[in-house]
Curated annotation (Swiss-Prot):
MF term (GO), any: exopolyphosphatase activity
Classification lineage: Bacteria, Bacillati, Cyanobacteriota, Cyanophyceae, Gomontiellales
Organism: Cyanothece sp. (strain PCC 7425 / ATCC 29141)
Superkingdom classification of source: Bacteria
Cofactor: a divalent metal cation
UniProt-listed Enzyme Commission number(s): 3.1.3.5
Protein's name according to its UniProt entry: 5'-nucleotidase SurE
Catalysed conversion reaction: a ribonucleoside 5'-phosphate + H2O = a ribonucleoside + phosphate
Length: 270
């Protein structure tokens, strides 16, 4: 398969190096287009008012891998690759392996997930991969899982382009309890802004905080007995959550239709 890889941790991240090398060794044609520096939590931001530069990178990856370091965001990387750097579209877009989980509402901020979502917007099935630790750097189990899942998808393709958001417990492969198809959970943070003063006496703020327990908020139309990604990770399961870019609140369509009197709203005073 022809694969396009990106991330938000940057071109020098061991996560993408492990993923790219593992997939190249499995015989895939691998292209890497990554930010040239750390770009975590940039969401789906794009660079509109500055030039985007891309430089070929040698000696970081498996010899068969073609790689570029891009000055833009993770979403810029995928857009640039599909629109300018590649001679043909890939079969799959992969983003990661991220250092740290992307669970529940994390995905709204995640550059990792946004890069993969950019592939889906272009009609290409995509995968976001995250290791659920900010300190453990053993990415091989997650890379092996991606390799094996791609082999399965090559024989049994997805019926439509979608994003598979995958989180892998930061454990040795033998200690991972299995794989679960999950629904997106909710992850809340207690945000704290630390007030500081720079050497010139100017005040600035540093965002900190801690993760709170997930909130049980079953989505209408989804089996509430199905584990959320947050719950499944607690049970040491690899999670696969299918995502889409259409954010329409479907039940809200009916609610608004019965609640709002649109003709009345359009009336103006004489």
């Amino acid at each position: 398969m022809k694969l396009l890889l990106s991330n938000d941790d940057g071109i020098f991240s061991p996560g993408i190096r492990t993923l790219a090398d593992t997939l190249a060794a499995a015989g895939h044609e691998v292209m890497v287009v990554c930010p040239d520096r750390e770009r975590s939590a940039t969401g789906h931001g794009l660079t509109l008012f500055d030039p985007i530069r891309a430089e070929a990178v040698a000696s970081l990856f498996h010899p068969s891998v073609k790689a570029w370091a891009c000055s833009g965001t993770p979403s810029d990387c995928i857009k640039l690759a599909l629109g300018a750097l590649l001679d043909s579209l890939p079969d799959f877009v992969l983003s990661g392996i991220n250092q740290g989980s992307n669970l529940g509402t994390d995905i709204l901020y995640s550059g990792t997930v946004s890069a993969a979502m950019e592939g889906v917007i272009e009609g290409i099935p995509s995968m976001a991969l995250s290791l659920t630790s900010f300190t453990v750097r053993e990415f091989q189990p997650a890379a092996n899982f991606a390799r094996d899942l791609l082999a399965k998808l090559d024989h049994t393709p997805l019926p439509e382009a979608m994003l598979l958001n995958i989180n892998v417990p930061a454990l040795p492969a033998a200690e991972i309890a299995g794989v679960a198809i999950t629904r997106q959970g909710i992850r809340r943070y207690h945000d704290m802004f630390k007030k500081r003063v720079d050497p010139r006496g100017k005040t600035y703020y540093w965002l900190a905080g801690e993760v709170l327990e997930d909130v049980n908020d079953p989505e209408q139309g989804v089996d509430s007995e199905m584990l959320t990604d947050v719950q499944a990770i607690r049970e040491n399961l690899i999670t696969i959550t299918p995502l889409k870019y259409n954010l329409t609140h479907t039940p809200g369509l009916q609610t608004l239709s019965t609640w709002l009197n649109l003709p009345l709203l359009l009336q103006t005073d004489p």
